[in-house]
Curated annotation (Swiss-Prot):
EC number: 4.1.3.39
Residue span, Pyruvate carboxyltransferase domain: 5-256
Residues passing through the membrane, by range: none
Amino-acid positions noted as binding Mn(2+) in the UniProt annotation, renumbered to this chain: 14, 195, 197
Record keywords: Aromatic hydrocarbons catabolism, Lyase, Manganese, Metal-binding
Organism for this UniProt entry: Salinispora arenicola (strain CNS-205)
Gene Ontology terms for molecular function: 2-isopropylmalate synthase activity; 4-hydroxy-2-oxovalerate aldolase activity; manganese ion binding
UniProt keyword Manganese present: yes
Site feature location: Transition state stabilizer: 13
Protein name per the record: 4-hydroxy-2-oxovalerate aldolase 2
InterPro entries: 2-IPM_HCS-like, 4OH_2_O-val_aldolase, Aldolase_TIM, DmpG_comm, DRE_TIM_HOA, PYR_CT
Catalytic activity, reaction form: (S)-4-hydroxy-2-oxopentanoate = acetaldehyde + pyruvate
List of residues binding substrate: 13-14, 168, 195
């Protein structure tokens, strides 16, 4: 490869989804030290939904944004401290500027894959301040390669130095990765990245496929710690980069040690694939919906897989969590109606 691959470790951001955003200061400090030793280029830290997202709607974090960022920054020397900012959750004055005061080195500004225009204010402002800024296209499986080129092109125009495709639902196949990443690499003048989820068991091969297609940024988490079925594990991505002799700063043994540190401290349950996470990948539904879907399933007595498939049919995206309850109630009502019909027929 002509450009050295950058590794963005999202363990302390995406991983927060897996523990209902309850990572503590000591956990953050310990893992930040391990990630620094492993040689990750960027350590992304924060609430699972990014800056300013701690709320009743999507989960209240155990630690404030500022406390998380300061705890991580104190342990970093060569790795950059990164944050996720989603307009609507994060605002410039309340969230972004205080985060920069905490030592944030780069910001990734995210939006749904067809709504890049909402990132304009934040990307242009950050770029004018001299901050490294990248764009994220969420739920990118939902858009064609052509649409992604158009939307990523807007982010490039606003000043983003890179655009990362987020497989928020774990719905990508290697062929989809080749097509979409390859198209962006060919058509844009900035770096392209890929953020995998493992709902279909393809996070590692999709990450390596992205690199082969020209991506120069890959996201990872320790033990795949993240929303739903988890992400591409840092230890497995590092191992595959080593085997394939792909150049990167990350150090294999230290990456393995970082994953061990995470499991010892806070990865209580290593992400696995089950009926719910697999259905989420098939339906193309945001991985972070797994836990609320399970809760709604128990509350209303309906199959969580049916909830996910209906959410997929409705093309529901992150931020529309209220729809989960609506769908569960509708399915429960349909089931009750069917039961009454059967009971009536049986008595005729």
């Amino acid at each position: 490869m002509s450009v050295k691959l950058q590794i963005c470790d999202s363990t302390l951001r995406d991983g927060n989804h897996a523990v209902a955003h309850q990572l503590g200061r000591a956990d953050i400090s310990a893992y930040a030290r391990a990630a620094e030793e492993a040689g990750v280029d960027v350590l992304e830290v924060g609430h699972g939904n990014g800056l300013g997202a701690s709320s009743i709607q999507v989960g209240i974090a155990a630690v404030s944004d500022a406390e998380m960022l300061r705890a991580a920054k104190a342990e970093l020397r060569n790795s950059r401290l990164g944050v996720l900012s989603i307009p609507g959750f994060a605002s410039v004055e309340r969230d972004l500027k205080p985060a920069l005061d905490c030592g944030v080195d780069e910001v990734r500004v995210g939006a749904h894959c067809t709504e890049a225009d909402v990132t304009r204010q934040q990307i242009t402002m950050l770029r004018s301040m001299g901050v490294r800024v990248k764009g994220l296209l969420l739920m990118s499986h939902m858009a064609s390669a052509g649409k992604l080129v158009e939307q990523a092109g807007l982010m490039q125009e606003y000043g983003a130095e890179a655009v990362v495709l987020m497989d928020s639902a774990g719905a990508y196949t290697p062929e989809m990765v080749r097509e979409k990443v390859g198209e962006l690499v060919e058509k844009l003048d900035i770096a392209i990245g890929f953020h995998a989820h493992n709902n279909l068991g393809l996070s590692v091969i999709n990450s390596i496929t992205a690199v082969r297609a020209g991506a120069s940024i890959v996201d990872v988490t320790a033990r795949g710690f993240g929303a739903g079925a988890g992400n591409a594990p840092i230890e497995l991505v590092a191992a595959n980069l080593h085997v394939e002799q792909i150049e990167a700063r990350i150090k294999l043994f230290d990456a393995l040690d970082a994953a061990d540190t995470a499991e010892e401290r806070f990865v209580k349950h290593v992400p696995t694939n089950d009926g719910v996470t697999i259905a989420s990948g098939i339906a193309g539904v945001f991985s972070g919906f797994a836990a609320p879907v399970r809760r709604a399933s128990r509350r209303f007595g309906v199959d969580p897989r049916e909830i996910l498939l209906e959410l997929g049919r409705r093309r529901v995206v992150a931020g529309q969590e209220d729809t989960i309850i609506e769908v569960a109630m509708a399915l429960a009502a349909e089931a009750a109606s069917a039961d009454l019909t059967h009971a009536f027929v049986d008595h005729i």
